[in-house]
């Protein structure tokens, strides 16, 4: 329908959790059709892991869509959370790094490039999906960003760290002190840092 109506690149599939339960033959036909239509994808890993397969006996369905295959096909895949502190997902915080963390585990996306792609799924990819202009760190962009207490994107997903600064249009609008951990054992005072340098 997307191609027939000339809407290529303007349609987004949210959740797509049914793809988790589709047989491989059907998906082998569906994904190329999605590529042809330039469909964008928003997976909701935390909600889908909690809600899908809830009433299954074993084996239980994971429920998250086929993120690895969709990314490999070149589709723009983003992660989100659509249920925050509600009856469906009372533990969701709205933190997209939680969504990326869950996706890494649920989707077996543990290769370094895959984990970096998961970080892009909560940063660059959603901006592209929304058609945001002036997004990014290039000269002339809007300077809307969040400074994390992490050395790289993989550490950001692993730690879900302190947001040191939230910057909007080049102005700091929120900030938090750096997280520090102190170890105080008899005769061995020390501090530890979970962030790799």
Give each language-model segment a name.
Residues 21-22, 50-51, 113, 156, ...:
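Glycine/Thr-rich phosphate-binding loops of Rossmann-like dinucleotide-binding domains
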Residues 18-19, 46-49, 84-85, 152-153, ...:
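Short, glycine-/Ser/Thr-/acidic-enriched flexible segments
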């Amino acid at each position: 329908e997307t191609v027939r109506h000339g809407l290529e690149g303007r349609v987004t599939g949210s959740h797509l959790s049914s793809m988790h339960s589709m047989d491989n033959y059907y998906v082998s036909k569906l994904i190329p059709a999605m590529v042809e239509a330039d469909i964008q994808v928003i997976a909701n890993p935390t909600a889908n892991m909690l809600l899908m397969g809830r009433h299954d006996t074993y084996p239980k369905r994971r429920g998250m869509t086929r993120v690895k295959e969709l990314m490999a096909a070149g589709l723009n895949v983003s992660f989100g959370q659509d249920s925050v502190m509600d009856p469906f997902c009372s533990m969701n915080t709205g933190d997209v790094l939680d969504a990326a963390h869950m996706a890494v585990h649920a989707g077996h996306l543990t290769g370094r490039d895959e984990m970096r792609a998961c970080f892009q799924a909560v940063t660059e990819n959603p901006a592209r999906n929304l058609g945001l202009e002036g997004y990014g760190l290039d000269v002339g962009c809007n300077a809307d960003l969040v400074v994390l207490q992490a050395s790289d994107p993989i550490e950001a997903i692993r730690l879900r760290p302190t947001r040191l600064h939230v910057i909007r249009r080049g102005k700091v609008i929120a900030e938090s002190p750096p997280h520090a951990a102190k170890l105080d054992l008899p005769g061995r005072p020390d501090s530890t840092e979970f962030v790799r340098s």
